């Protein structure tokens, strides 16, 4: 009987964990695109453009796009940005995704020296307390969420960003819209 309670608890935790991510598109879809991203990565910025210009317009009503954090050690402020995105998503659902877009669109303007000020300005511009947003960078619970994503990615064999998984099928760093769309279309057809 103990194993049953453990299994139920694990299922409940797994269900809750899915909602901690920034999600775009259909929250109810069984077709999931996991996006392992580093918010200081130029290739991730390119993928963000593909997501905004091609994937979301075509699939927002039918596919769940989940953002996962995979900050690379070579990027000085990527982990802070991932933590900030987690805080902002909790403070105001959807704002974490907006921040991810902002960080990727401004990755050449943001640096270690101005990171906190840029975060503060973003938070203030969205009606949040800027000091709380900056203080959240030291929140160990949020840092653990980012680290959990990173470790999950490592366990899946991910080493580069962006890595996109279409119901488990990987696309790594640079890939064409047509290839991702073909995989999504196949998963949508299989789910019918």
Please place each PLM-identified region on the residue numbering.
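Structural alpha/beta surface segment adjacent to cysteine/selenocysteine redox centers
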Residues: 37-124, 190
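Generic structural signal for beta-strand residues in well-ordered domains
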Residues: 24-26, 34, 58, 157
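C-terminal cap of thioredoxin/glutaredoxin-like
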Residues: 36-38, 48-49, 120-192
